[in-house]
Every structure is written in structure tokens, then in C-alpha cells.
A protein has these predicted regions:
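N-terminal low-complexity, acidic/polar interaction/targeting segments
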Residues: 1-236
Length: 236
């Protein structure tokens, strides 16, 4: 039987890949509670792309496949403690098996960017009980890593597709190929020994929308991964 566990979920407008670094500024009370709980536990939560077609108790719902984020640093932004800055790094991918809704629905006209919004949520949280979780949780199943190697030939093909996509999308402006080589150098993507992580990073460079990266994250075999990245890089 496959083992599952319950983790906090942070829906975001981005896709986090394994071993990628992700800095976040935390200001909403529900996500400050999430970070506080993580710091008291194993320092891990799930990052999922927002599912624009669904809500969970009135809040943005997560896509079903995400990545565990491990908090590596946490500090207050200001002395008032209203904002936190955390640094995280991606770990395993996971599949959501069951959503556990948050205790609170968003209040009418709730604005998380204001002090008033913070006060309203805090008052509601005290009313419902401070032991209740304001954030989404989920029962998740961890997804095994892709262990297969990527041949240099396949990697060079992906790089060529990426370059062609950038050059074509820039028209009528001319993009010199050597400038794209500099971009690859900047992101440490010049290699003779490519790995899955290189493919993830190149995909991020080739995507205009985070939704374009979700199929990449959902790829669980090397064949699926290469197919979806080639599809992403192909100019339509």
C-alpha cells in the first residue's frame, strides 16, 4: 500500500520543480500560520499551481500535482512581525489524494494587503478557535524521482528548440544566437552532462505562463518529460 501523509498546501501562481530555490514573502495571516506550523514541525509544505477553475471553501484551489518545499531560512521583514521572508528549496513531487479545507472562508471584501484585512481574519480565527487551520491541507502521495539519464543529443535538441522559439517569438526584432548562449551561461545551463534538473530549468526559460509548466511537472517518466518539453518549445 502506498504511503500518504498530510501536509500544508500553498497554492501559488507558479510551478516549483524539485531542487529549485523559491524565496517567498509571507504577509497573509493564514500563510503566517502555515509557516509557524512548519517551523514547529519538519519545515515542509506543498507548493501547487493555482487551479483557476476551482475553489476550496472560497479560496484558490491547488492543482493536484505539486512539489514539497523545505524552508531553509525564515526571518521577519519588519520589526512589527506582520511580514515574513522565507527561503525554500523544492524536494519531492507529490499527488494530492484528498483536500482538507481551511476552517475559514474569505470574508466579504477581504483584502490581504491591508491592516484591516489582517484584523478581520484574526478576529474570525479567534472566534472559530486558534487551533483551527486557516490554510488548505491535503493528504498526499509522494511521486518517485525520474532516475533516467538524458543523452547529450536529446539535451542539445531541446536547447536548439528553445533558441528557435525565442528567435521566432522576437520577430521582427532580431535576436543573436550568441546572446542566447550568454543566457544559458547565466543560468548555468551549459553542460555536457545534462540531468533532469537542467531540463526543468530550460523549461522555465521557455514558458510564458506557469500553466505551460504544469505538464512538465506532471511528467513521471523520461519519455513523458522529453515529449512535454519538446511540445512546450515547439513554435505554433
Amino acid at each position: 500500500m502506498t504511503q500518504t501523509k498530510i501536509i500544508p498546501i500553498f497554492p501559488l501562481d507558479l510551478v516549483l520543480f524539485p531542487r529549485q530555490e523559491l524565496p517567498l514573502r509571507i504577509f497573509e495571516p493564514r500563510y503566517k500560520q502555515l509557516v509557524d506550523d512548519c517551523m514547529l514541525g519538519d519545515g515542509q509544505f506543498g507548493v501547487c499551481l493555482i487551479d483557476q477553475s476551482n475553489l476550496v471553501n472560497g479560496w484558490n484551489a491547488p492543482k493536484a500535482t505539486g512539489t514539497i518545499a523545505k524552508i531553509t531560512k525564515c526571518e521577519d521583514v519588519e520589526m512589527d512581525g506582520l511580514q515574513l521572508h522565507i527561503e525554500t528549496v523544492g524536494r519531492n513531487k507529490f499527488q494530492i489524494k484528498k483536500i482538507i479545507p481551511p476552517s475559514l472562508a474569505p470574508p466579504e471584501n477581504y483584502d490581504p494587503y491591508t491592516v484591516e484585512g489582517h484584523n478581520i481574519i484574526s478576529e474570525l480565527h479567534e472566534k472559530f478557535g486558534t487551533g483551527e487551520k486557516m490554510y488548505i491541507q491535503a493528504e498526499v502521495e509522494l511521486i518517485p524521482e525520474i532516475d533516467d539519464d538524458i543523452s547529450l543529443e536529446k539535451w542539445q535538441n531541446l536547447v536548439s528548440l528553445w533558441k528557435n522559439k525565442i528567435v521566432t517569438q522576437a520577430l521582427p526584432q532580431v535576436v543573436e544566437l550568441h546572446s542566447l548562449d550568454h543566457v544559458l551561461e547565466k543560468y548555468y545551463l551549459t553542460t555536457d552532462m545534462p540531468t533532469v534538473d537542467y531540463v526543468y530549468s530550460l523549461s522555465a526559460l521557455g514558458a510564458k505562463d506557469p500553466n505551460d509548466l504544469q505538464p512538465i511537472l506532471e511528467s513521471n517518466t523520461i519519455e513523458q518529460l522529453l515529449y512535454n518539453v519538446e511540445k512546450l518549445m515547439t513554435v505554433k
